[in-house]
Amino acid sequence: MTTRIDTRFAELKKQGRSAFVTFLMGGDPDPATSLAIIKALPKAGADIIEIGMPFTDPMADGPAVQAAGRRALNAGMTVTRTLQMIHDFRKGEGSTPVVLMGYYNPIYIYGVEKFLTDAKAAGVDGLIVVDLPPEEDSELCIPAMKAGLNFIRLATPTTDDKRLPAVLANTSGFVYYVSITGITGSAAADSTAVGAAVARIKRHTTLPVCVGFGIRTADAARGIAERSDGAVVGSALVDALSGSLDAEGKATAKTVNAVADLAAALAAGVRSARQAAE
Amino acid sequence: MNSLPNSFRSGPDARGHFGIFGGRFVAETLMPLILDLEKAYTEARADAAFQRDMAGYRKDYIGRPSPLYFAERLTEHLRDISAASGRAGGAKVYLKREELNHTGSHKVNNVLGQILVARRMGKKRIIAETGAGQHGVATATLCARFGLECVVYMGAVDVARQEPNVIRMEMLGAKVVPVQSGTRTLKDAMNEALRDWVTNVHNTFYCIGTVAGPHPYPMMVRDFQSIIGDETRAQMQEAEGRLPDSLIACIGGGSNAMGLFHPFLDDSSVEIFGVEAAGHGLDKLHAASLTGGRPGVLHGNRTYLLMNDDGQIQDAHSISAGLDYPGIGPEHSWLHETGRVTYLSATDEEALSAFQLLSRLEGIIPALESAHAIARVVELAPERPKDHLMVVNLSGRGDKDVPQVGDILKGRRK
Ligand SMILES: Cc1ncc(COP(=O)(O)O)c(C=O)c1O
C-alpha cells in the first residue's frame, strides 16, 4: 500500500530536500477561516499538513495550542466537522498529505471503525494520537493500518534504543521525533543533539524522520531540515494566527495571510537546507 | 454485565486492565518512566524492608491504626428515624476515623507509600495535583519530612475555596501553582501536572492523589489505601466478633473507598456502597461519573467520564472540591459493571445537612467529601435491622471546609 505520505517523501527525495510540515488546530478560530487557511498552505510551501482535532483536555500541549483548541471548540468544531473540512479541502487538492493529530477520547466516542472509514473517505492520510503508546496498539493503530491509514508515532528523547523497536514496530508514513521532553511550544533543542537523535532512530528504521517542537523561525527550520527528513512547525503558526485576531478572538481580514506568510518564510528556510544526510 | 470473576481482588491484569477499564494512555515521553515506576513498585511491594519501613511511618508518623468508632448518638438518631416510619430498625453505625490521621485525611496513606517509592527511585522532585488540597497537604508534608522539592498544581477555583489548605502547603515549603486553564478545577490541575511531568520527566516523580491515571497508579494507590479495609476487618472482629454487613464511602476518584472496600470484595455477605457527588442534582451540574457518564479515555486510563456526544470532557460540579472530578478510578468502573459495588450519589444540599448532623451529634466535623457518605447512611441505616453493622469511611476532617460552610450558613441566616 502506497499512501500520499509515501508518495510525497519519494518526490522530496528526488528533489533532494526535506519536508516542511505545518500544524494548525482544525476549526481555529472558526471552521470557515480554518478551511481557508489550510487551502492556502500548499501554495505557501507546506509539503504535509497536520490538523489538530480539538480536545478539552490536551495534556501534552502548551498554552498556544490549548488556546487554539478552546477557540475551535467554542466555534463549534467537532470530529464530524473536522472530517468535513478535510473533505472540502480535498475538493481542490489531491496530492498534499493530511495528517490528523489529537487525543483518543473523541475518536473512541465517535467509534473507531466509523472514524477510520469516514477519515479515509474524507481524504485523511495519517493519524497521530498523542495518548496511544504502542502498549495500546490494538485500540486504533492496528485497525488504522488495516484501513489504509498511516499511524505515525512520536519518538522522544526518553525513547531509548531498547524501546525504539517497540515504538517503530507498527509505525508507518514517517516517524515524528519530538526533540525535547516537554509540551508543544516549549524551547527548541539544539540542532546538534537533534542530528544525533535522528541518526540514532535511522539505525532502527528506513522511514523518514521528521522533527518538531520548538521550531519558530526560518533559520531554525533550515537547521532542522539539514539534519532530518522534515521540520514540523506548529505553535509559531498558531501564534501568528492568534496574533491576527480581533479583541473578541474572531478572525480578521489579516488572518489567512498572517499564517500563509509565515508558512512561506518557513518553507523557504526548509528549502534552503541541504538534503538530509542519508 | 460481565460474567463474575472468581475473585474481585485479583485485578488488574499484566497490562493494567480491570475488564475493559484502566490501561496506559499517555504520551510516549512518559511511557519509559511509567514502566520504570511499575518495576520499582513491583520490587518494593515484595521487599520486606520496604514494608517494614512503611509500617513504622504509618504507626509513628501518621498515627495508625486509625480508630473504628461506634457512633452511638448517630445510631440512636437513625433508629429514631426508623421507628418514626414504623420500621423498628436502624443499623449500628461505625466510623472509620481516617480524619484522625496526620494531615487530616486518608490521602496521607497513599502519599507515604509513593514517597517511599520515589526515594527508592532516587527522585528528588515531587509534583502532585490537588482538589480539596488534602492530597497536596499530605504531599507537602512528606516532602518536608524527607527533604524533597514539592510542587502542587491546584485549580484557581479550588485555590480560592480551600484557602486554609493553600496556606498549609506553603507553610510546609511547597510551591502551589494556581491553574488557570480549562475549568480551573481538579481535572485541569491534573492536566497541568502531566504537562510538568512530560517536561521534567528526568528528575520528577508524579504523586497521583487517587486510584486513577495510567497503570500502575490505580493498583498502587489502592494497595497503599487498603490499610483502611485491613484495619477495619481486624477492628470489627475485635469489637463485634464478625465482619461488618455493609461498607460505605464517598467517591471523588475513589481512593478512600477503594481502600476500605478492597479487602472485603470477596466477602459476599458484605454489601458495599460508593457515593458520588450529585452536585446541584443528577439532571443538572454534578460530578457523578458512573451515574451520568460513560466509558472513555482521559488522564491515562479508560473509565467512566462525564462528556458530551463529541467526546469532549464536561465540567463536573460539587460543593466539595475533592469530589469535583469528571472521572473515577477504573477499578470502580469495573466494580460497577460487575455489580459488586452499588454506586449512589448525594447532592450538595444533602452533604451540607449531613455535615451539620454529624458535627452536632458526634462532635466530629467531617470533610464535605465524607459528608456525602454520611448523607446516604442517613437513608440506608434506618432500612437495615438493628444488628446490621455498617462502616462509614470518615475520609477527612472538616477544618478545611469551615470557612466555606460557615459562609454558606451565614448567608442563609440573613
Ligand atoms: C477528605 C477527602 N475525602 C475524599 C476525597 C476524594 O478522594 P478519593 O475519592 O480519592 O478518596 C478527598 C479528595 O480531596 C478528600 O480530601
Curated annotation (Swiss-Prot), chain A:
UniProt entry keywords in alphabetical sequence: Amino-acid biosynthesis, Aromatic amino acid biosynthesis, Lyase, Tryptophan biosynthesis
Regions crossing the membrane: none
Known pathway: Amino-acid biosynthesis; L-tryptophan biosynthesis; L-tryptophan from chorismate: step 5/5
Reaction catalysis annotation: (1S,2R)-1-C-(indol-3-yl)glycerol 3-phosphate + L-serine = D-glyceraldehyde 3-phosphate + L-tryptophan + H2O
A GO MF term: tryptophan synthase activity
Keyword presence, Lyase: yes
Cited Pfam families: Trp_syntA
Assembly, per entry: Tetramer of two alpha and two beta chains.
Job of this protein: The alpha subunit is responsible for the aldol cleavage of indoleglycerol phosphate to indole and glyceraldehyde 3-phosphate.
UniProt-listed NCBIfam families: trpA (TIGR00262)
Protein name: Tryptophan synthase alpha chain
Record organism: Nitrobacter hamburgensis (strain DSM 10229 / NCIMB 13809 / X14)
Source species taxonomy: Bacteria, Pseudomonadati, Pseudomonadota, Alphaproteobacteria, Hyphomicrobiales
Gene: trpA
